[in-house]
Amino acid sequence: MTYGTHNHSPARARALAFAAPALALAFLTAAAPAAASERWATLQAIHLLENPFDTARPGSLGELGAYQFREGTWKMYTSAPFELATDRRVSDAVAIKHYEWLKAELERRGFEVTPFRIALAWNGGVGAAVARHPAPTAVDYANRAANLAADLSRRELAYAK
């Protein structure tokens, strides 16, 4: 018996060549909803920590909206007036842009993107998310957000069944 050799017939090779693009497309489209679902759960967890009752009242540092954006962060992603941070639809759109920027920064720096690390960056900045010893308050926030995101994801899966 010979090990390590492959006997690929021309017919099998053609079938694999034909199927490969379809399999790749199936993989990519299956991964996209999972990534969007994780993003949704993470952002919803952040919202629940930041402003669970959707109050329009500014935070102690002038933060506004569901995600308690500071004006400088808001202006990184939109030219819309900062007051629109209290509009959940507008705030959600900006939150997605901020999430994607944080995700890209973490990936660029070689870090795995997880709900914990996104929340750590959201609360303490990218520097906190890549630091060896981030502030305990930021770690606590990130742990709470990651736990909430995991719970939201479990509930979403349970409803889907």
In which residue ranges do the predicted regions lie?
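Extracytoplasmic
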Residues: 38-43, 61-64, 113-115
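Catalytic and substrate-binding regions of cell-wall glycan-acting enzymes that process beta-1,4-linked
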Residues: 113-161
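N-terminal targeting signals for Sec/Tat export/insertion, comprising classic cleavable signal peptides
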Residues: 44-72
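Bacterial N-terminal signal peptides
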Residues: 19-30
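Alpha-helical segment that forms one wall of the substrate-binding/catalytic cleft
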Residues: 71, 75-130
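Sec/Tat signal peptide C-region and signal peptidase I cleavage site
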Residues: 32-36
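Short, functionally critical alpha-helical segments immediately adjacent to catalytic or ligand/cofactor-binding
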Residues: 38-54, 95-96, 118-126
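Bacterial N-terminal signal peptides that target proteins for export
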Residues: 3-20
